[in-house]
From Swiss-Prot:
Cross-referenced HAMAP family: Ribosomal_uS19
Keywords assigned: Ribonucleoprotein, Ribosomal protein, RNA-binding, rRNA-binding
Pfam families: Ribosomal_S19
Gene Ontology CC annotations of this record: cytoplasm; small ribosomal subunit
Keyword rRNA-binding: yes
InterPro entries from the UniProt entry: Ribosomal_uS19 (IPR002222), Ribosomal_uS19_bac-type (IPR005732), Ribosomal_uS19_CS (IPR020934), Ribosomal_uS19_SF (IPR023575)
Organism superkingdom: Bacteria
Molecular functions per Gene Ontology: rRNA binding; structural constituent of ribosome
Record keyword rRNA-binding present: yes
One GO-annotated biological process of the protein: translation
Name by which UniProt lists this protein: Small ribosomal subunit protein uS19
Function according to Swiss-Prot or TrEMBL: Protein S19 forms a complex with S13 that binds strongly to the 16S ribosomal RNA.
Entry similarity comment: Belongs to the universal ribosomal protein uS19 family.
């Protein structure tokens, strides 16, 4: 079920204040955040946000196509290393 339109999108307050400050200055710095649940808004376009994936911060450049999505969608938390090659017993 999606979020109510009456409430508006969720954005962490600390992240929103950092973006507003950078927009006032016209500065382009990498913003570190742990808030994967924050929704991308049009004010974030053109900024690079480093989203935490559980181990490190993954830098993400925000473009127009990303608006409305969550930050966590662009920072995968799991790495797939492939299936084991030499498992002969499982094939029989």
């Amino acid at each position: 079920m999606s979020r109510s339109l009456k409430k508006g999108p969720f954005i962490a307050d600390s992240l929103l204040t950092k973006i507003e400050k950078l927009n006032e200055k016209g500065d382009k710095q990498v913003i570190k955040t742990w808030s994967r649940a924050s929704t991308i808004i049009p004010a974030m376009i053109g900024h690079t946000i480093a989203v935490h994936n559980g181990k490190q911060h993954v830098p993400i450049f925000i473009s127009e196509q990303m608006v409305g999505h969550k930050l966590g969608e662009f920072a995968p938390t799991r790495t797939f290393r492939g299936h084991s090659k030499g498992d002969k017993k499982a094939r029989r």
